Amino acid sequence: MTTSFYFLLMALGLLLYVCQSSFGNQHTRNSDTPKYRCGSEIPNSYIDLCFRKRNDAGKKRGRASPLWQRGGSLSMLKARAKRNEAFHLQRAHRGVVEHCCHRPCSNAEFKKFCG
């Protein structure tokens, strides 16, 4: 009886794993789904999307990103976003605030504002 119980338990676990891996991604959000970015989300997205490749390359060589070396840069970006300034993230007279806060934009659209 215990062998059949363990077999049934393993089969149930395998079935749950297969169902989750097959159907589990239906309700997850695609990373490039357009979304609204306002306030402090703008500098956070800017740092994440524009400096991710540079930071990953620096990690491979053991160097930190220049933004992390200067601790004040991150807080400066966040402070500017709180004051609703469209700082240096502008493209052809349309700032990132107008483009991604007033209507949703994808990661690919946001990366166009990387300088």
From Swiss-Prot:
Expressed by the venom gland. GO terms for molecular function: hormone activity; toxin activity. One of its GO terms (cellular component) is extracellular region. One of its GO terms (biological process) is glucose metabolic process. The modification 4-hydroxyproline is found at residues 34, 104. Keywords: Amidation, Carbohydrate metabolism, Cleavage on pair of basic residues, Disulfide bond, Gamma-carboxyglutamic acid, Glucose metabolism, Hormone, Hydroxylation, Secreted, Signal, Toxin. Its main location: secreted. The modification Cysteine amide is found at residue 114. Residues 1-24 form the signal peptide. The modification 4-carboxyglutamate is found at residues 41, 98, 109. Disulfide bonds join 38-101, 50-114, 100-105. Residues 25-29, 53-94 form a propeptide. SMART domains: IlGF. It is found in: Secreted. Is possibly an allelic variant of Con-Ins T1B (AC A0A0B5AC90). Belongs to the insulin family. This venom insulin, from a fish-hunting cone snail, facilitates prey capture by rapidly inducing hypoglycemic shock. It is one of the smallest known insulin found in nature and lacks the C-terminal segment of the B chain that, in human insulin, mediates engagement of the insulin receptor (INSR) and assembly of the hormone's hexameric storage form. Despite lacking this segment, it both binds and activates human insulin receptor (long isoform (HIR-B)) with a high potency (EC(50)=12.0 nM). Heterodimer of A and B chains; disulfide-linked. This is Con-Ins T1A. The lineage of its organism: Eukaryota, Metazoa, Spiralia, Lophotrochozoa, Mollusca.
